[in-house]
């Protein structure tokens, strides 16, 4: 809110304007929806989304798109935020066009976790919105182990968790789950869409495009 909110909005809009493959003549982001902030590696991370329009194919009418990404900064204990960074992209795959969706997810890798004997994982910023009723909390689970969780705020959430676990035997990928206030699971989504299974048995997976 206030001047700081305006500063964050300006940084995010600048990142949106710098998207390399944004179609020429696209309408920039309108009102920005902010997701709960989380802290990791000495920085504060605030995901964001906003609507706009773009001409996806020459000679066609503009269609709605969603801008998505985050603003990140360092918050010293006794001074103003500094070292602002932002990332943005866009998609024309929207939740409003997919009534079967239960969770609207976005994600971006923001770092790497390195363990012993070459073990590693992608530290991933995950944000989204519950599209089912009565959702109270969200969890990120890796191999059925909860690695982050948080209550929802206005049906929105932000998590930071390790994903794409490697060199632990079987690879591990995050599952995002919604829960009601009584601890009943309401929905479950992966960050990945399994396209095919190659002959060697390893699933060929592709990240879902975030949408709202």
Language-model regions: role of each:
Residues 196-212:
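Low-complexity, Pro/Ser/Thr- and charge-rich linker/hinge segments at domain boundaries
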Residues 1-32, 136-138:
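Short, non-transmembrane alpha-helical segments in secretory-pathway proteins
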Residues 24-41, 110-117:
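Short amphipathic beta-strand and strand-loop transition segments with alternating hydrophobic
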Residues 119-200:
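Ser/Thr-rich low-complexity repeats and stalk/linker segments
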Residues 12-20, 43-116:
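A general sequence property marking short-to-moderate contiguous segments
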Residues 46-48, 83-86, 126, 159-160, ...:
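Generic recognition of long tandem-repeat/solenoid scaffolds
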Residues 1, 9, 40-41, 50-54, ...:
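N-terminal non-globular leader segments, chiefly Sec-dependent signal peptides
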């Amino acid at each position: 809110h206030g001047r700081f909110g305006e500063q964050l909005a300006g940084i995010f809009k600048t990142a949106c304007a710098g998207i390399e493959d944004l179609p020429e003549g696209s309408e920039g982001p309108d009102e920005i929806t902010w997701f709960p902030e989380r802290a990791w590696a000495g920085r504060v991370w605030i995901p964001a989304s906003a609507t706009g329009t773009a001409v996806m194919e020459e000679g066609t009418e503009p269609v709605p798109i969603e801008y998505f990404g985050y603003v990140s900064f360092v918050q010293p204990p006794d001074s103003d935020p500094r070292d602002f960074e932002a990332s943005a992209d866009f998609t024309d795959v929207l939740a409003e066009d997919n009534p079967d969706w239960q969770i609207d997810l976005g994600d971006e890798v923001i770092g790497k976790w390195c363990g012993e004997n070459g073990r590693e994982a992608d530290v991933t910023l995950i944000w989204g919105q519950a599209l089912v009723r009565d959702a109270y909390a969200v969890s990120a689970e890796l191999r059925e182990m909860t690695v982050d969780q948080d209550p929802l705020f206005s049906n929105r959430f932000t998590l930071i968790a390790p994903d794409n676990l490697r060199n632990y035997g079987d690879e591990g990928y995050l599952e995002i789950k919604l829960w009601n206030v009584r601890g009943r699971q309401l929905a479950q989504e992966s960050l990945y869409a399994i396209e095919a299974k190659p002959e060697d048995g390893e699933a060929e997976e592709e990240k879902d495009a975030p949408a709202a």
